[in-house]
Each structure stands twice: as C-alpha cells, then as structure tokens.
Amino acid sequence: IGSLHIPVGYKDLIIRGELLISKENYEKNFKGKTSFSNPRNFVTGLIGTKNPNEIKKQLKYIDFVSYAVLNPVLKQGLQFKTLRELELNQKLKCVHFEYISSHLTTELLDTHLSQTKTKDSYEVDGIIICHNENYTNPVSGNPKYAFAYKNEQFTNKKQAIVLSVEWNASKDKYLKPKI
C-alpha cells in the first residue's frame, strides 16, 4: 500500500477505512490456491500472519478502502466528497456514497444492495444507512447514527448440524470448544 500525499488544506486529516482485496485479485491470484474460502477471510488471515515475508509478498494485492473522515468533523456527504477528491488525486480508494431516497423501503434497499454486490469491485455483504449530518464518532463499537442493512438472501451462510463439541482447557485455563 503506497504512501498518501495529503494535499494542502488537509492538515491533521484522519481517515478511517479497511483493508480489502478486490474480487478480481482474489479470483485471479488466490482462489483455490489458499485455505481461505473468500476475499474477506484471506485479508484477515494475511494481516494476522506472523510471517512478515508472506505479508510483503501479498500486500501488493491489498487495498486500503476509505469510508470516513474522522478529522476534521464533517457531514457525511462532505466526508465522501473529500474522500472522492483524494481518490482522484492520490489513487486512494473509497467506498461509494449515493443518495437513494428520503423514504427508504425494504424493496428499495434490497434492489440497491443487489446492484451494489454485482457492480462493486469488492465483496459486499451490506450497505450502511445514515443521515447527512455531523456526528461524533464513537471511541469503540458501532456508531449510533448509522446502521448496516443486510439481507439473508444475499449472504453465503449455510446451516449445519453440530454432532459433537470437544472442550479443551487452554494454557490459561479457558475452555475452548472444538467442533
């Protein structure tokens, strides 16, 4: 992930985002060649590895995708405008922001989620709904001013029956289940 040169006028800029691999990069370079079943698990596994050479080798496939400006405090729409400017000028990737409607319905959200899953470069499991206002970001946990809309129809969840659970004590005396 290359360095980001912040343009003049963005003093003390703080951006929040997440590390992702595009569907294309995962399919082309890692699907079936790794123990990770999907792009999200692949990135989590890569970041969690203790092997720095493995991280270095595969980091070129990982993108930092921004989705919020924490400082300065801006309305949601202005945050995305700022991120879009940085994306165009600095090749910083950002999530897509669009006004859907002032009257949201399940049908409208399902349609938007389906279209987003199809056209987005990254694996998407939901969309975030929020009002275009200034908000204080929480120190921990999810923000109270926004919520994630997901639909079971669009997820890769499977139902399974657990036949047995083996409980083992860890070195710190915690019980850990093994299915």
Residues of each region from the PLM?
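RNA/tRNA-interacting regions in translation and RNA-turnover enzymes
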Residues: 1-179
